[in-house]
Amino acid sequence: MPKNSKVVKRELDDDVTESVKDLLSNEDAADDAFKTSELIVDGQEEKDTDVEEGSEVEDERPAWNSKLQYILAQVGFSVGLGNVWRFPYLCQKNGGGAYLLPYLILLMVIGIPLFFLELSVGQRIRRGSIGVWNYISPKLGGIGFASCVVCYFVALYYNVIIGWSLFYFSQSFQQPLPWDQCPLVKNASHTFVEPECEQSSATTYYWYREALNISSSISESGGLNWKMTICLLAAWVMVCLAMIKGIQSSGKIIYFSSLFPYVVLICFLIRAFLLNGSIDGIRHMFTPKLEIMLEPKVWREAATQVFFALGLGFGGVIAFSSYNKRDNNCHFDAVLVSFINFFTSVLATLVVFAVLGFKANVINEKCITQNSETIMKFLKMGNISQDIIPHHINLSTVTAEDYHLVYDIIQKVKEEEFPALHLNSCKIEEELNKAVQGTGLAFIAFTEAMTHFPASPFWSVMFFLMLVNLGLGSMFGTIEGIVTPIVDTFKVRKEILTVICCLLAFCIGLIFVQRSGNYFVTMFDDYSATLPLLIVVILENIAVCFVYGIDKFMEDLKDMLGFAPSRYYYYMWKYISPLMLLSLLIASVVNMGLSPPGYNAWIEDKASEEFLSYPTWGLVVCVSLVVFAILPVPVVFIVRRFNLIDDSSGNLASVTYKRGRVLKEPVNLEGDDTSLIHGKIPSEMPSPNFGKNIYRKQSGSPTLDTAPNGRYGIGYLMADIMPDMPESDL
């Protein structure tokens, strides 16, 4: 190199001697600087602005105020309405206490590893679901778009359930509760009980007729239900206001929305234990039926529940974790949140069956009283001989044990005539075996139980306020799974995007507040999420393990966590989880194919539910929900594979860091190029290859040398490579 070259002069003046290769070999200095810089997302051009080290600069990408706030957000997202009204039903249906064993096994094999995977990629790359999968491979960017579509489909109908809860909450401030008794109908001559209510029950009538004013089929829209329209609007306004500033606004609400449901559940459990029959309900719940546990259907339903309970594939988990510090222990978070979710489900199951045990006891006492009166009538009429009734039994004040004794005697003596007597066995187990889930549990069975509580309005207010908070916690994560990826990718303002999303969702959601809206909720719940989310998570697993590389990913985790994660995760991610997810997908497709597509319609004349098949247009909608949700995956792959559009979303130009200002050199993630850093302090930018540090130090000195202008940039590197180039060109 000529002595008078500008590069030599720089070396003499500024003690700069590193070549491009030397610069790329620096490691220690970059590692030190890693801890002093913070990630922001910025789509603007780089600014030649000096920022003093240690100066207070507000990050453009928000961060959690505390670890507790983050954990509560993840818990609020994963613990939702399904924990209260689906897990108890599955537990009862699939062997009682024995169901907990397959659930725990699948939680360890599928749940925690995949939850840990989503947390770690979000925290490492610090983007939403679209950016994360673009980063790993631009051809797989459709995975993130598919997550957003599924999130939006789910948000459309999930917020309707919050609207229903708001309606019941608003109606709970009266004594007696409006669903306590059947309404009376008056005409010119006399007063009588509403026939539809008399044939069903007061709570069933109130749900279908007063709340939903439901039509007889999905084809009869019946117009909008104005009461539910107002409640849906209120629900979306609440979500919009809570999410308009992202985690900066929702983070403050999370403390209440995540913790309040636990307060209510514990209060309900204590209150239920003081009521007659609660122990019967819990005993019935946890009596194991081991023979059922070996059925394949039990394991399929347990795997599906684990999958959806943790919110896998929605993108909310990735979005929340993207606001974490890079060195956060996401493995601890995955295990903690997973087991909190499990114990919440068990707690909710205890509460549900303690309350249903009390309800069954009340109904059983009424049954015994009514049937005892019927037996006394038969005794007076001579249909039954007084001699067969034991002398120590008084049918006027009969106990359950004595009634069952009399019932068995009459059944044996009057064997041929017994069916004509229309006597009921009045066994509490039969009442508890009437499995209910979903809206049937929350808005019919549980509301009926609360009418028998002392101070029933108070408990009703608490219960439906709990449902609102459970729903909002899940909605925050769902909306975050939509907004964060789009903001990161397209650089739109979060406030504007949030308002547009909520406004559009309310307008589309009007189909759910028609008189036939409940049938559309069932349709979306059955078809919009199950298959698409399974496909999304399978592709996530493949992307990390086989496209990016499981070995490099394990190195990244070691770099982030400060310790090597157990090899257990290596084998789960690479072998076990993909096989189990594929098996679950096949089983779900087979089950969906064997189950006739339809819904339970409320028939007013019969005052009962009746299964109806979807009309042709309904089948088209069902198929469209699945296709539209998963369509972004092949579309993005084809577009990127054949370069059909000029797209730079595979670059890292959108990721910048303050404190040392400013990283801005696009890098193709599919190539081996290394990004270039501009600034006085090397930044904490994720490298295109997770397992490699961008800088490597040659001499081991504590600081990384810079050019005279304080930059690492194109000009400085080119000066070292091409010394004869004019300085103005550098």
UniProtKB/Swiss-Prot annotation:
This is Sodium-dependent neutral amino acid transporter B(0)AT2. One of its GO terms (biological process) is sodium ion transmembrane transport. The modification Phosphoserine is found at residues 25, 55, 687, 699, 701. One of its GO terms (molecular function) is branched-chain amino acid:sodium symporter activity. Glycans are attached at residues 187, 213, 383, 394. The keyword NADP does not apply. Residues 41-60 are annotated as: Disordered. Residues 163-225, 357-452 are extracellular.
